[in-house]
Amino acid sequence: MDSCEVTKTRIPFKERPDWADVKPVPQDDGPCPVVPIAYTEDFSETMDYFRAIYVADERSTRALQLTGEAIQLNPGNYTVWQFRRVVLEALGVDLREELKFVDRIAGENTKNYQIWHHRRWLAEKLGADAVTNELEFTKKIFSQDAKNYHAWSHRQWVLQALGGWEDELAYCQQLLEDDIYNNSAWNQRYFVVTRSPLLGGLVAMRELEVNYTVQAIRASPENESPWRYLRGLYKNDTQSLVQDSQVASVLWDVLTSQNSHVHALRFLLDLLCHDLEPSQELKSAVDVLTPQSCSPDLALTKKICSILEHADPMRVKYWNWRKSMVRVQLLQSQNAERLANLSVQE
Amino acid sequence: MESRKVTKTLEDQWVVERRVREIYDYFYSISPNSPSDLIEIERDKHFGYLSQGLRKLGPSFSVLDASRPWLCYWTLHSIALLGESIGGKLENDAIDFLTRCQDKDGGYGGGPGQMPHLATTYAAVNSLITLGKPEALSSINREKLYTFLLRMKDASGGFRMHDGGEVDVRACYTAISVANILNIVDDELIHGVGNYILSCQTYEGGIAGEPGSEAHGGYTFCGLAAMILINEVNRLDLPGLIDWVVFRQGVEGGFQGRTNKLVDGCYSFWQGAVVFLIQRLNLIVHEQLGLSNDLSTESADDSSESELSDEEEHLEGISSHVQDTFPLGQAGACQENASHSPKIADTGYEFINRPIAMRPLFDSMYLQQYVLLCSQIEVGGFRDKPGKGRDYYHTCYCLSGLSIAQYSWTDEADSPPLPRDVFGPYSKCLLEQVHPLFNVVLDRYYEAREYSQACETVSPLSLAPTFSET
Ligand SMILES: [Zn+2]
């Protein structure tokens, strides 16, 4: 590993002949700083020299090398990164070399904003040439941490700015096969289905996606991710959602199974609030789950909230609130009806 | 029935659940009737850990060398939440240090001589507000800060973290937060911000860091708070957001940051504060649910009538509070219309003075239990979850979240919570109250507002406000 040369036998800047002309600039911490950090000798010295070239705005090869050393000591220093970009541009350095540098730093710092931002800057400069490499790189990150937020943002940016959509849906599929609970993969799936220029958009993809999602729900009804995804497939089109027979059928299947009913009930409640006319089967499935203390004449929506108050005690206050909202919605429609009747009579 | 495949998500989740259950079982075994009596905030230990951090940090903190205003904020805000004080000398040292982080062209960097950055600007400004002295507030160059904020504006409507930096919802929040609290907001600054944040609300209901990304607790707080501050919160899908956030509280009692991720103490604030903010948005929520707010008196009258009176039976035994859950038509709830727009510059003040017409939609006691039993470390400090180490970030946000949970049942700002709403012995556990939009202690917010109001608004900005001379 040639990248270790710096850390292995570091020669202090003050002993390096090519730095003899530079006067280090100490940090202006004041006489009694708060949150003072007990820097190592190497750290202090490197930063003192960095300040010197930063203040002098020296865009040179040695400045580039110095920023590299400073970044290895603290990859979170955005000032160093920003100055490095300035120097890179001034020197016209081959940015593929720069990518190798970032790869070396990235290893232990997959949650660092600066590195990802620098990668994005690089990929933007490299253009279409960077696509394969960036998609592979993020894949490698996901093999260790499939939910890495920065890596997903980066991947989405690459797809949108530079392309590479061809295999993305298959990749989501594969990640979900590995772990159907991986919500980041579901989110990416939504991203691809709604934004890929190759797939025709959400409406065109909907039927296929509903099939897939309904299967995932049947396999693990307690998994929140596919339920939210299913709702997302009908974003801004609840009319179609309410009419989808596949949805009604998966709801019935789950409600009559031994599995957790929480998400199915939540989903059904949502549908009812969007004027779903429930089938007799669904009504009876809910009745079976309704606590005996409930009056049988209670509205279906309120029954569902009552079941959820028991089945999901963590959110009892939420379900209670939902029930109270249903109550008012009901009252308002009654009032509206009454007013309508009045005006008819008049 | 297909058998459920055990995946990494499930395995990780089970490990955490087991650890947490062991802790709860232990506490309930030593005191089955009132385990919370045994719990308290280790105030002295936390104070020791925090003031130690202010005075000296080891070499391992070098990786936070570009986040020193954050270290100030995490420690100073935590100390303020505990109701402790660090003394005049250390306070002056903090003001002096932060002044050295202030850029000559406005904003604060991660340390002396570093470029100004929005996140560290937020941390520095909140630190100075927490210090609260006139010298602290007057050390902020408001005029230059305004030009820095304007310089960070991006064509997308969002903000950039620093010159050449990344654009995301965090940047929007930190910019809007400092602008609001320092009374330097104007139309130019907020133009397009609402569109940007709106484009980050996902199909799940929460808010992501960038358009297309996954809904996330930290960004959801930032997005919601910023939308409230620019008075455009009615543009978000609030019922969807509520439904997402209440499902982030897990069986452990604490919150997770994203769907199917692990519980983490810091989300006690990020997610807890989202629910807390929503409690003051009931009028807009009703509007979005298609409920007209002026119907409230009618519904209050009608609610005594037959069809609704079966309500009470299943409320009993669930919670002593639930009858209060829906106080539509209570005094104050309808005094102002949801579309009424306060002066943008004072949305933070108007917001905190709204009556809280909605009860918390999360389990605030259970959240407190998680923070105190699972995140708190006996020797001082707080952590993400059992098995992890303490740090200043988690200490700050666990304490902030604890405060949010403790005050979530209060009716209005400035009123103390009832003992039954505070987990553990009241006097030992009760923290100071925060302003949920800025996450600074409420009293310090009022002082800062008084100061900022005394300064002139954007153009021309006064550099010598009268307040500092008293
Ligand atoms: Zn955390």
UniProtKB/Swiss-Prot annotation, chain A:
Disulfide bonds: none annotated. Its cofactor is Mg(2+). Transmembrane segments: none annotated. Keywords: Magnesium, Prenyltransferase, Repeat, Transferase. It is an enzyme of class 2 (transferase). GO terms for biological process: peptide pheromone maturation; protein farnesylation; protein geranylgeranylation. It comes from Solanum lycopersicum. Heterodimer of an alpha and a beta subunit. GO terms for molecular function: CAAX-protein geranylgeranyltransferase activity; protein farnesyltransferase activity; protein geranylgeranyltransferase activity. Its EC number is 2.5.1.58, 2.5.1.59. This is Protein farnesyltransferase/geranylgeranyltransferase type-1 subunit alpha.
